[in-house]
């Protein structure tokens, strides 16, 4: 659900544009009731009354299809097969934050700790919390170490990539030959931009079967992770993520099984995921977004007063000749 203040603000708009069908469903489906304190009867209802339209976040296909920079640091990784996670590590206990970052690490370690050390894949964590400071980096590192500590020497490799990367650097990360698949246990996305960008690699994506990313991740080309809708935990709640809300929690056993299958049968999953690239190039590019935006503006601009240009008189035209008057 969305906060009531958000509803009040939205109703001051003429048109509300959101990035996904999921976001639209949440916005139009949220309502607050005002009841008579004595009778308990509903006397008023607050919900969005203005039109809500969906406009996806188009991907720059020129940058994310053809990276012009190389992240040479990744060449040094000991593991040739690596899962990639991209997202903020926000507030919340392990298993309760919005991106479910801690459980991505724990599930990965649980699955691959049984393989011989030279056969284990790695996990690249492109993550941070509030910023990109040294303090933030060390805090993230401590969180990762805390999750891996119980696994001891059996823990597979987890790499932290911390810092602000440009679009070209992110594209280089996605396309690097040592990045084999992307994984996300997200509890809820308005859109899921890193997932959209990664589709242009044509590599496998494992992602929660819920929320905004479903718009551009066709089931036939994606490894969708099962789960269920659960309550927001107190440790993750704030003024935007309300305690009264619900979101998605991945079935970790299902996720573990599918992560292993992608690793163990990679070539078949690579064939399956090739359609992700075609789908984004055809339906979710910046150019396609522009087309949809123009259609939307044409639809809602009808009846809106148009600017009328002010036309100055042509001063170069022949001046009118006035008659000459005789002096008296």
Regions found by a protein language model. Name each.
Residues 172-190, 200-203:
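Acidic donor-binding loop of glycosyltransferase active sites
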Residues 15-66:
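Donor nucleotide-sugar binding/catalytic pocket of nucleotide-sugar-dependent glycosyltransferases
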Residues 171, 196-204, 211-215:
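Short alpha-helical segment that forms part of, or immediately flanks, the ligand-binding pocket
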Residues 129, 238-328:
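C-terminal amphipathic helix plus adjacent low-complexity
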Residues 61-169:
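Conserved catalytic-core segment of nucleotide-activated headgroup transferases in glycan assembly
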Residues 95, 185-192, 214-215, 238-242, ...:
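Nucleotide-sugar-dependent
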């Amino acid at each position: 659900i969305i906060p009531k203040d958000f509803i009040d603000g939205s109703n001051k708009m003429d048109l509300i544009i959101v990035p996904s069908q999921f976001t639209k469903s949440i916005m139009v489906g949220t309502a607050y009731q005002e009841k008579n304190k004595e009778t308990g009867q509903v006397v008023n209802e607050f919900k969005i009354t203005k039109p809500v339209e969906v406009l996806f976040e188009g991907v720059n296909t020129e940058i994310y299809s053809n990276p012009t920079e190389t992240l040479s640091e990744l060449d040094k990784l000991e593991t040739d097969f690596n899962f990639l996670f991209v997202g903020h590590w926000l507030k919340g206990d392990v298993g309760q934050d919005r991106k479910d970052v801690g459980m991505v690490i724990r599930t990965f370690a649980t699955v691959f700790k049984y393989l011989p050390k030279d056969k284990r894949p790695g996990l690249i964590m492109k993550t941070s919390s509030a910023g990109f400071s040294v303090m933030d980096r060390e805090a993230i590192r401590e969180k990762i170490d805390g999750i891996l500590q119980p696994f001891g020497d059996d823990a597979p490799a987890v790499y932290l990539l911390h810092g602000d990367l440009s679009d070209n650097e992110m594209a280089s990360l996605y396309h690097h030959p040592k990045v084999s698949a992307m994984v996300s246990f997200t509890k809820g996305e308005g859109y899921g931009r890193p997932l959209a960008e990664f589709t242009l690699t044509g590599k496998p994506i494992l992602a929660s079967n819920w929320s905004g990313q479903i718009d551009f991740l066709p089931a036939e080309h994606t490894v969708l992770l099962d789960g269920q809708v659960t309550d927001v935990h107190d440790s993750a709640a704030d003024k935007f993520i309300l305690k009264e809300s619900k979101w998605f929690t991945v079935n970790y056993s299902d996720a573990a099984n599918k992560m292993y299958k992608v690793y163990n049968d990679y070539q078949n999953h690579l064939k399956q995921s090739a359609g992700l690239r075609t789908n984004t190039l055809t339906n979710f590019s910046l150019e396609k977004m522009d087309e949809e935006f123009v259609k939307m503006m044409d639809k809602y601009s009808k009846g809106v007063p148009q600017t009328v240009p002010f036309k100055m008189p042509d001063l170069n035209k022949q001046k009118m000749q006035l008659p000459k008057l005789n002096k008296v």
